Amino acid sequence: MLFNAVHNSLPPNIDIDHAILRGEDHPPTCAKCVARGRISALGSLDLRYHSLRCYAAPPDVGRCEFVPPRRRVLIANQGLDVSRLPPTGTVTLLLADVEESTHLWQMCPEDMATAIAHLDHTVSEAITNHGGVQPVKRYEGDSFVAAFTRASDAAACALDLQRTSLAPIRLRIGLHTGEVQLRDELYVGPTINRTARLRDLAHGGQVVLSAATGDLVTGRLPADAWLVDLGRHPLRGLPRPEWVMQLCHPDIREKFPPLRTAKSSPTSILPAQFTTFVGRRAQIS
């Protein structure tokens, strides 16, 4: 224990340096040395414990629901709901887009405008009903992203979206679980990239999951839902292939063409190994 180590190494009534964070969004901890403050180490064991404890990080630091104190104050001043903030840490991302969106907009722009408005309402309602959060209304084009602290909630939300009539729109949905980072209220990093590549594998009306998410939802799926193993597939631009699963339910389509895996293509027109022509005049003449 930190307290025991400090108590056993120091005599009573001496000063101890403790790190204090000032003007930061993170709570003070003894490991950070941003600004120095001094407290007196009292002789009483109980007083020492409480003195040191006031510098320790709150027990919920590191959880995806944790919101730094300073940010909570700013949120409260603006009248925002803390529960609707994008979660960080380990979360399950749901990333979806409209299949053949560009073609649909060109062929029937008025119908698509109505369908997109209906989609926005349906997506917002489904995400809220399952405890998810949308960092932004739109991610890229007609795609959207939602974050869930529980993988089972993300799977239930994806299933509800596919069971809802959105014609002429058909959604391609990918689910993946991992560590996420927020930058300007947008998720960045490997997890969002892998989720996007998973979504790109899917067809309209299909929900695909990574192995990480599949493991978490096994035994926790909505009633009558099940998973189908689609095997291991490469993901465009990523070095590690992914074991892909499909979320199935009697109310949604089950059979699809093979996943949209990127076809391998040469990355260079140069030979794999250079050939020297020095001393080979006879052969090349």
Swiss-Prot record:
Sequence ranges assigned to domain Guanylate cyclase in this UniProt record: 92-199
Tree of life domain: Bacteria
Biological process annotations from GO: cyclic nucleotide biosynthetic process; intracellular signal transduction
InterPro entries: A/G_cyclase, Adenylyl/Guanylyl_Cyclase_3/4, Nucleotide_cyclase
Pfam family name, one: Guanylate_cyc
Single annotated GO MF: adenylate cyclase activity
Family label: Belongs to the adenylyl cyclase class-4/guanylyl cyclase family.
Name the UniProt record assigns to this protein: Uncharacterized protein Mb0915c
